[in-house]
UniProtKB/Swiss-Prot annotation:
The keyword ATP-binding applies. This is Cobyrinate a,c-diamide synthase. It comes from Sulfolobus acidocaldarius (strain ATCC 33909 / DSM 639 / JCM 8929 / NBRC 15157 / NCIMB 11770). InterPro entries: CbiA/CobB_synth (IPR004484), Class_I_gatase-like (IPR029062), CobQ/CobB/MinD/ParA_Nub-bd_dom (IPR002586), GATase_3 (IPR011698), P-loop_NTPase (IPR027417). Catalyzes the ATP-dependent amidation of the two carboxylate groups at positions a and c of cobyrinate, using either L-glutamine or ammonia as the nitrogen source.
Length: 434
C-alpha cells in the first residue's frame, strides 16, 4: 500500500513541533487529503492536528499498542488518504526506553524524519544537534525546519551549520502571537483555547511563505510501502454508548471511539451541561480531562450524577479513566470540598505533584477490560491523588506505575471500572465482548 508520510521530530519538547505539524497539515490539506498522527499517548496535541485537517487524528504508541498495533493503525487509517503527517513525542530518542521512541517508530514503519529545531539562543550549534541526532543511531533524518529565527543573519548561521546530507527546508520567524498557553497537563485543549484555529492558520501562512512544502512532499514519497491492513471492519451493534465530552472531559483517543462504534451507537453528553440522556445506555464512558477546573459546575450537575449512578446500580457497564474516575469519587478537595457522584468511597485531592508515565497492570479480578491473570498496559497523566480510601475493591495490581492506592488501580462496583490509567482499546478487546 503506497502511503507517503513523514515524521516531525526534534531534540526535545517545547521545540514547536505541535504548531509546525498543525500548520503543515493545514497547508497540505489545500492540495491533499491528509491524515494526522501523534506518536505517544498524548491527548492534547492531536486536537490541534484535527482542527488543521478536519479528520480524526490517530495515536501511534508502541507501549500501549505494540508494534503490530501501531503498524496496523498507521496502515488502516492511511487508507484512502494522500499523505500522513506524524508528530513525534519529546526528543527523537526519548520514551520509556529507546524501544518506545519516535526513532523506533520511524525504523519500524520506514518513515523519513524531518526535524524542527528551536533555534532560540543558538546558531552554528544547530548543525551539531542535527548531526548528532542523525548519526547517533543512523536515523533517517531527511530535512530540518528552523523555528524561532530572529533575523536573516541568524538564519544564515543556522543554514551554514547543517550537514550536506540534510535538506534545509525552511524556517519560521519569531512571532510571539503564535503561541499556545500551557498549564499543568500541557498545552491548553482546543476546547479552552478559543484562538486555536487562528494560531494554526497564521502558522500555516508562515509555512507557505518560508518552507519548501513541495520538497516535504517529495521526502514523504520516499517512505516504504505499507502492508495493507486486513482487519475486517464488522459492526455488531448491541446498544447505545454515551461518552462524556466537554471542557472537563475531553481526553479520548479517536481510535477508541471508532472501536466502540463496532459494538455501540455512540452519542456524547456533557456533565457540565447537566445532561441526563433519555435513552437507555448500554455503556457509559467518562474519559480524562480537567474536572479540577470545573468542580463547582460538576458538584451542581445533579441530573447527570443521578443518571450515572442510577444506571450503574442497574448494571449498565461504565468505564471511567483518570478525570472520569475522579468524578465517580465521593468528593474532590481543592481548598474546599466538592461532592461528586459517590459511586466509589474515595476522597481525592485535586492538586498534588505531577504523575506521568506508562503503567502495566496485573489483573486480579475479571473486569470490563481484562480477565484475571492477564496483564494490560496504560498511561497515567494527572496531578491529583487519592487521600482517603474506604471499603473498595481493586481489579489491578500495578507492575509498573503508581495507580490509585498502595500500588493498586481499577476500582470496580457492579459493572463499572474506574482507574487512573488511560487505556487503548486495541489491546483491551474484552471490552467489546463483556
Amino acid at each position: 500500500m503506497r502511503f507517503p508520510r513523514i515524521i516531525i521530530s526534534s531534540d526535545r519538547s517545547n521545540s514547536g513541533k505541535t504548531l509546525v505539524t498543525a500548520g503543515l497539515i493545514k497547508v497540505l490539506s489545500k492540495r491533499y487529503k491528509v491524515r494526522g498522527y501523534k506518536v505517544g499517548p498524548d491527548f492534547i496535541d492531536p486536537m490541534y492536528h484535527k482542527i488543521a485537517s478536519g479528520h480524526p487524528v490517530i495515536n501511534l504508541d508502541l507501549w500501549l499498542m505494540g508494534e503490530s498495533g501501531v503498524y496496523s493503525s498507521l496502515a488502516k487509517y492511511g487508507k484512502h488518504f494522500d499523505l500522513g503527517i506524524i508528530e513525534g513525542v519529546m526528543g527523537l530518542y526519548d520514551g520509556l526506553y529507546e524501544d518506545y521512541s519516535t526513532y523506533k517508530l520511524s525504523e519500524l514503519t520506514h518513515t523519513p524524519l524531518i526535524l524542527v529545531i528551536n533555534c532560540s539562543n543558538l546558531s552554528s550549534t544547530v548543525g551539531a544537534i542535527v548531526k548528532g541526532l542523525r548519526e547517533y543511531r543512523n536515523a533517517n533524518v531527511r530535512g530540518v525546519i528552523f523555528n524561532y529565527i530572529a533575523s536573516e543573519k541568524h538564519l544564515d548561521y543556522c543554514k551554514k551549520s547543517i550537514p550536506e546530507n540534510v535538506e534545509v527546508l525552511g524556517y519560521l520567524p519569531i512571532d510571539k502571537s503564535l503561541s499556545v498557553p500551557s498549564r499543568h497537563l500541557g498545552l491548553y485543549t482546543t476546547e479552552d483555547f478559543k484562538n486555536a484555529k487562528d494560531v494554526i492558520n497564521a502558522t500555516a501562512n508562515l509555512i507557505e511563505m518560508n518552507v519548501d512544502v513541495d520538497k516535504i512532499v517529495e521526502i514523504a514519497e520516499e517512505a516504504n510501502e505499507l502492508q495493507e491492513s486486513n482487519e475486517i471492519e464488522e459492526r455488531n451493534v448491541v446498544g447505545k454508548a454515551y461518552v462524556a465530552y466537554d471542557s472537563a472531559f475531553s481526553f479520548y483517543y479517536d481510535e477508541n471511539i471508532d472501536i466502540l462504534k463496532k459494538r455501540y451507537d455512540v452519542e456524547f453528553f456533557s456533565p457540565l451541561n447537566n445532561d441526563a440522556p433519555a435513552d437507555q445506555p448500554s455503556f457509559i464512558y467518562i474519559g480524562g480531562g480537567y474536572p479540577e477546573l470545573h468542580l463547582e459546575e460538576l458538584e451542581n450537575s445533579t441530573k447527570t450524577k443521578d443518571w450515572i449512578k442510577r444506571n450503574v446500580e442497574k448494571g449498565v457497564k461504565l468505564l471511567a479513566e483518570c478525570g472520569g474516575f475522579m468524578f465517580l469519587s465521593n468528593e474532590i478537595i481543592n481548598e474546599k470540598s466538592y461532592r461528586m457522584i459517590g459511586l466509589y468511597d474515595i476522597q481525592i485531592k485535586a492538586k498534588d505533584k505531577l504523575t506521568i508515565g506508562y503503567t502495566e497492570l496485573e489483573t486480579e479480578k475479571d473486569n470490563l477490560l481484562s480477565s484475571k491473570g492477564e496483564s494490560i498496559r496504560g498511561h497515567e497523566f494527572h496531578v491529583s491523588k487519592a487521600v482517603s480510601v474506604g471499603d473498595v475493591n481493586f481489579a489491578f495490581k500495578n507492575k509498573h506505575g503508581k495507580g490509585i492506592w498502595n500500588g493498586k488501580d481499577g476500582v470496580y462496583v457492579e459493572n463499572s471500572l474506574g482507574s487512573y490509567s488511560h487505556f487503548h482499546f486495541s489491546r483491551t478487546r474484552r471490552l467489546l465482548s463483556f
